[in-house]
């Protein structure tokens, strides 16, 4: 492709300026040489005396190789693209703040021998392998200042619940609910929730020969959060090979490394079809109560459709990412323009579709979007390209690292051996949680975080590995990573003041890390305006628009990218109360914090199974992996109960003993350590309960297996495979 390049200086030190100038000159000369080669897309530039210039046989990360002394002769690598496709990814290297690159329509820039890294749309950035001097004391001070200006005493109460006059924000825009007769039948297993938790558990039950399963879903189809989230640009930020469950079982090959929402929704439907889960499912149906009938030894499930179903076993996987929340901004109810939440995107108004078609309905519209979290990062580039004027109201910027997405090569995919997905899952989890593996199969931003920490630890051979040395390694590597991320903002955003406002001043894991190659570019669009509130948030909303920083912005459309209810009570998020033996409600049982065995079983609630992250693996970066293990465990227990039925000649109930529940909680609590997201270096967000202390209750609600996810997955596999199901009672 044609190569355009602009290089400039961003570091102030004389050495850095000299280095930047030199590299900029080299890159420009190499790019100029590449313009004469029709097949060249990405250049490699090495420096004599620093690193040996690689040959075509040793480096497959570029389409061309050049040497600083011989940039006029560009050697093409014959099968570079094929090799890249073969390994399924680009090389991963660090972005270098010494090289300042302005975003131009189509270009690539030079890279050193460490490789190349895509840092924007049609943009590749270089690494020099040089360290950046960081004043860590000044950085801590800056982090605390940014945190303090955002702290609020109301925590989660700053958000508005979508009830009453706001209930329209949760209407289903995808289907029209049709009337049906209420159901009064009985099933062996009912699962509440049709997302990946329900689909995976249903699949595991099907594999165990248990087919009398009903999934109850409030959406119009399977998919869970991916049924609701169809905003433009919606995409998973965990690699599809480990995020999409049951790929081998369904025979599906992801089309790209980070799949977009339409494909994820299609895969949810594929799982439903493959395992016959549609046969007995009910959609557009919300559970209103779940009550244990001790005489009948059945769960009674009541819904908003008048149903009163009965189920011997019930599993719950309602998840936190389906119930939207609105910002509690004064006057929000007075706005008279068009408005919607990103999880209920109104394509009838904006034009376009979930596949990425232009939002041509906004061509003459002044659009405001509130929020700059993971959802906003993905949809803002689409809004910026089409809206006449786009106003992005920001309280806290997200950290935006490289995504480096690419298509998957079908020929390479066919080389994967049976059992590959289980191997990739454990490889990803091992590396992402600080373990060691011979190879990084996924190679993404998540595993890079842990790789950096390991590199820091290993850089001091002989040093005793303790929690303190780990934290020190984490802090040092994070300081360097966040410095790179902030430098990347300078490299991609043309306006200096906008770039400064987009820089995240906190640790990378304080908030959900974002990976995107077009978001920062969006602020170079002439009609896109960042309205940074310096942590204060919007002042108020009126009938015509938004007040921020003492200025009024008239808007035709206001979009809320304000996220979901994550830290609220389970009964509030799920929309129903669960009542167990002797009339005890689950919310009362958990009044002092979650109590369970494996995050699945709760004493006093027989034949009930929970699918959660807490008090189990608690793997946040790849949630479906948790579901695979929980689903397999639930299926094994129900299958065992049915076998006991046959052996005993009567039905049994399954329940964790009070002692086993208490022992499990005590074991986890004894090993719980302070979460890094609760440090003074972290700005408020849903990762840390909006910066509010939660005490012991919060620890119980969020703690996981002390030895980590990998150890938990190994433990739970041994536990369910033993056939003893220690801690459970199967009572006739």
Spans of features found by a protein language model:
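Acidic/histidine-rich helix-loop elements
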Residues: 352-354
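Polybasic, low-complexity intrinsically disordered segments
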Residues: 11-12, 59, 63-123
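Intrinsic low-complexity, disordered N-terminal segments enriched in polar/charged/small residues
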Residues: 6-9, 30, 34-37, 42-45, ...
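Hydrophobic helix segments
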Residues: 14-20, 42-43, 51-53, 64, ...
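Intrinsically disordered, low-complexity segments enriched in small polar residues
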Residues: 12, 17, 22-24, 29, ...
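N-terminal Rossmann-fold NAD(P) dinucleotide-binding loop
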Residues: 198-199, 376
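N-terminal FAD-binding dinucleotide-binding subdomain shared by FAD-dependent oxidases/monooxygenases
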Residues: 129-189, 194, 206-333, 337-339, ...
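Gly/Ala-rich phosphate-binding loop of Rossmann-like dinucleotide-binding domains
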Residues: 202, 206-207, 380, 384
